[in-house]
Amino acid sequence: MAGANEGDAMSADVKYHVHLNREMLAGAEVAILPGDPGRVGKTARYLDPEAHFLASNREFTSWLATLDGRQVLVCSTGIGGPSVSICVEELAALGITSFYRIGTTGAIQPDIELPCVIITTGAVRLDGASTHYAPLEYPAVADLELTNSLVAAARELGLPHRVGITAACDTFYPGQERYDTFTGYVPRRFQGSLEEWKHLKVLNYEMESATLFVIASVFGLKAAMVASAIVSRTRSETPDDAVLAQAEENLARVMKRALQLRGTARS
């Protein structure tokens, strides 16, 4: 099956940003969404050593894997809600009905050990993109079936994991109250927010889950989120290379087993 690249002419039914069409997806109904394009091939090959490249355009790189006889798409989204919204819109139009977001994260709760697996049940909507689909009163919640598959996988694999609420921000620095920035200043609305989320039992920060959950719910689709903590925000801002490598391996293991437990592409 031929792949596509940024220079290829747009053919019929190829979506503008992801450069994919239904034929390329070969009936896939499940998509795994890492943020980093560099993780796509690794994730796909963990599911299937024969996985192959499909397309790459801007932040959207995609590979197709086969797991237990069913097709699974792995497609990067880049960072943040706006690019996630583009990816979900275009993949949904191509027949994807279930979305698993995977990524790394910063732990808020000080008792979370690295690289703990964190499975999100709902997100604090600190993003802007989700408000273009539903008002702030609308909850950002994960699909129960997909979430349960992740929890069951983590338990079966014996991996330390936590299940709960995530703070989903539009920005990596001020929105997550980081002071190691160009100016060193955090706007007043975010000053003290890390401590507040800690007291409200929010587990972690990331940047995509709220947008993904809201869009999936509005569209009648399914979405879940699993991340691996690579920093503890109450102790450090810089991830260790060994922790990062273990985090990526843990995510791949959990994701593969969750798909197997769920039946891979059953919607």
Task: Kindly label every feature range from the protein language model.
Residues 233-267:
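His/Asp/Glu-rich mid-to-C-terminal helical/loop segments that flank catalytic regions of hydrolases
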Residues 149-157, 215, 254-262:
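Generic non-transmembrane alpha-helical segments
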Residues 2-149, 153-156:
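Metabolite-binding pocket within alpha/beta catalytic cores that recognizes anionic/polar moieties
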